[in-house]
Amino acid sequence: RHRPACAAAARRAREAGYDGVEVMGSEGYFINEFTAPRTNKRNDAWGGTAEKRMRFAVEIVRRVREACGPDFIIIYRLSLLDLVEDGNQWDEIVAQAKAIENAGATIINSGIGWHEARVPTIVTSVPRAAFVDVTAKLRPHVTLPLIATNRINMPDVAERILADGIADMVSLARPLLADSQWANKARAGKPQSINTCIACNQACLDHVFENKRASCLLNPRACAETELNYTKTFKPKRIAVVGAGPAGLACATVAAERGHRVTLFDASAEIGGQFNYAKKIPGKEEFHETIRYFTHKLEETGVEVKLGTVASAENLSGFDEVVLATGILPRRVAFPGSDHAKVVSYLDVLSGRVQVGKRAAII
């Protein structure tokens, strides 16, 4: 039932004008469950040996090819690392890759880790392009073009992968939520204007797994492009934005792009708000990128920036609109002893105002 259904779905995609499809054979989804001994406990023609376990995947690719013809692109996302107990061994993965190629795939994409895996693969703390060596390891075994993936968020990272011959292409997903113009900006040689994905997963994967609409912490328009249309204004205003954290920065630059004259106020000596604390945490260095992006964006859009300036009624007079984006304060949890001098907030620690000893309890 599933094999003809996959072929029929691919055929409909072709009829709708698509040049190809990707068959999802990784990340612990249905097809991957057939290939891995962890989940395939069958003792019939579809389970047991590695050859039988990969049969379902191979048959899907073969049927899609038969249904869609020789010139249709079939990308197969192959799990190169399951990263779970009783996953596929490397020799089994190589055998799968060869069988998938023989079945008619056009390109092999790299799948890294099941969703159940406890090994981080895409979070902020994972170094950029951390798993591309696994893609390179497969290259001698197949003749198909290979795609590298996971934590490839800037053009220089992608270019290095291609220049070193690690892969023939790179795959981007979350970076295109952060900045839908990523490829155009890369092609134009303007990487500094890219709103870089920081791999926080807060509004993309977290939302999807909660059955909510995917979006992006850094880009409120992600997946809402038809609802949030930033059109040019017919009546420019003088707008003051108070607070140079992520929300204030986004508001100021969007308003300026729409044609308003914008002044951004912040009492701090630098933009970024609480991102300046986040970037100090080991594993969250990518948060530097958001501040880098908005530094460029403020200059590009002509926003007047007044740092080290406390907004007051006096210096806000004369503006047509005032936007408050002053952020939040740490929530204090009341419990016996919470008023003790040794009870401090994360801001106290990350700012360096308080030095924590060797033993600390975090609530």
Segments predicted by a language model, with ranges:
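Beta1-alpha1 glycine-rich phosphate/pyrophosphate-binding loop at the start
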Residues: I108, V241-G308
